[in-house]
Amino acid sequence: MDNPTDTAGKCPVAHGNKPRGPSNRDWWPNQLNVQILHHNSGRADPLGKDFDYAEEFKKLDLDALKKDLHALMTDSQDWWPADFGHYGGLFIRMAWHSAGTYRITDGRGGAGQGQQRFAPLNSWPDNANLDKARRLLWPIKQKYGNRISWADLLILTGNVALESMGFKTFGFAGGRADVWEPEELYWGPEGTWLGDERYSGERQLAEPLGAVQMGLIYVNPEGPNGNPDPVAAARDIRETFARMAMNDEETVALIAGGHTFGKTHGAGDPSFIGAEPEGGAIEDQGLGWKSSFGTGVGKDAITAGLEVTWSQTPTKWSNYFFENLFAYEWELTKSPAGAHQWRAKNAEASIPDAYEPGKKHVPTMLTTDLSLRFDPIYEKISRRFLENPDQFADAFARAWFKLTHRDMGPKVRYLGPEVPAEDLIWQDVIPAVDHPLVDDKDIAELKAKVLATGLTVQELVSTAWASASTFRGSDKRGGANGARIRLAPQKDWEANQPAQLAKVLGVLEGIQKDFNAAQTGAKKISLADLIVLAGAAGVEKAAAAGGNAVSVPLTPGRMDASEAQTDAHSFAPLEPRIDGFRNYVNGKRLQFMKPEEALVDRAQLLTLTGPEMTVLVGGLRVLKAGNPEHGVFTSRPETLTNDFFVNLLDVATQWVPATGKEGVYEGRDRKTGAAKWTGTRVDLIFGSHSQLRAFAEVYGQADAKQKFVKDFVAAWNKVMNADRFDLV
């Protein structure tokens, strides 16, 4: 894997030459950015709102496509020649780097949208010359058109590269629909490529970041900050791979497996390399990193500045990586480009040259390769793989599948004939529906039974929201399906009010048991469905109390996951530390976000628009579905009204910081000074931020009472069904 270091110090923002006035963000850099709620809204989609990628994919002749990809592997082009006559190593790196931006903290990044096509990823130093890989693929993409997305093609090509070199992959699933504009993510605080201002204390990597430097996928292959220390590098590897949801065995398998093929490129000084794609000339047509060193390609190529080939058979699956790693002692040296790398001591030249037949080189390794030998935990795993090649092959196949499919969500989203039959725990498995579902009559009766228990609107709504609002549109995890709110760790999360949650779940489980036992046939209701049903009943009751009769729909079909189907550790990153919808902040608040920023961030993960976020906050506040101390701007709590907006926007109220309470404000009567309300930054942002205030004014108007309830129910239902991919 190439990890170029040649553009350090350059600004990662591509600036145009044409003068322009400053943007709003230039004038007010601390302004809350709500535009992320409207990215990839469909207006930029050239395929139109009616295009169904899943249906198009079904028309794909996958065998024919793979045959064409196999042929491409050895169809070397003069403008970008194939190392060793085979593009396999290049395409593995392309697929790896497409998927490798995934981070478990917020589920963002990954291969699911084909973001490698866009800035900044297309111009990251770590992705140098992958523009050539995608350009090599264009004739095939052009041939198969909309039947294969770029997102799927990048991963499939990596699989075919492995298969063409003798490796048996675990499988492939299609279903990654392309997007048409770059995702606006927080990739770090740095303003220069390869900057590393993301650390504090004893090399504590800031959240939610998953790489050690700006523009890298994981780690610096020369070692931390270029220090060639394999043990120190192992610490960086362990941290960054863990943030991609990989354990130690998967980490070793991925590094060794990927480095069984191909080579890195450091034929000359990085100063010979030109601008990245986004900074290139218009005539370069999106190709960057043009090199003036020699021919600039093939034997003269410069990508990472490192010049390493790991295996005696770099176009064939083998165990040479581990054999070489343990067969030699290693001495520090430098590549022709001046980068730190390692050379085997007293070794014969056994590594083939990529372009000169018969020429051999001494085995070489990266600092991060040696980490697999000198870190004591990695070393044990590596020796086991050395002695058991079949275990290594299986571990790499599974880890590669996880790497390339981690952000796709549940298996119901997988498409194609190569989907593995085996269920894997990281897929957050949910049992298939195996019984008749409740009908409208049952739903009405169950709602009545729920309300007859005496559970309050607040308890019903809070529980349903806690269950569903874990959903992340980024990696399609979380949500109400599976009823994992009753399992560890979710049942113990502070934001979920564990004591109240246990009470509500106990009552609902009793209703579920009685209903299922009373059926003469096989009809059942899952607890997952019943939790959502109970929340709907609570919303209906609250709306009726405000004079609006509404029916909150329920589409049954959720099932209950078991503890055995749940990796509790992997759900820890889904725990809310700041949840603006519930006005919740705990002691482990996110240091890189203000509460209002965390609200927008959570809304984006829930795939909500600005108006949807606004109406949900207003409704949840008056229903007391969260922190009851602040933001409940109503004299009739648990009644679904637009009171939150009416009272927030009341010009007779003056807001002042509360004494001794950071982030809390008091709303006082302008004339008397009497305290009326207390609110948080999240509450007040809807009166302070000009765009959010515009949304709030719509819902605070005298004629908005019915619209508010209608829009709240629609947004509520969207969140309740966010993970129902079976309905799409």
Curated annotation (Swiss-Prot):
Induction: Expression increases from exponential to early- and late-stationary phase. Induced by H(2)O(2). Signal peptide: none annotated. Its EC number is 1.11.1.21. It holds the Pfam family peroxidase. Coiled coil: none annotated. Residues 1-26 are annotated as: Disordered. It comes from the Bacteria. The record marks 93 as: Transition state stabilizer. Heme b binds at residue 259. GO terms for cellular component: cytosol. Its cofactor is heme b. It is an enzyme of class 1 (oxidoreductase). One of its GO terms (molecular function) is catalase activity. There is a cross-link at residues 96-218 (Tryptophyl-tyrosyl-methioninium (Trp-Tyr) (with M-244)). Formation of the three residue Trp-Tyr-Met cross-link is important for the catalase, but not the peroxidase activity of the enzyme. SUPFAM superfamilies: Heme-dependent peroxidases. There is a cross-link at residues 218-244 (Tryptophyl-tyrosyl-methioninium (Tyr-Met) (with W-96)). The active site is at 97 (proton acceptor). Belongs to the peroxidase family. Peroxidase/catalase subfamily. Homodimer or homotetramer. Bifunctional enzyme with both catalase and broad-spectrum peroxidase activity. Important for stationary phase survival. This is Catalase-peroxidase. It comes from Rhizobium etli (strain ATCC 51251 / DSM 11541 / JCM 21823 / NBRC 15573 / CFN 42). The gene is katG.
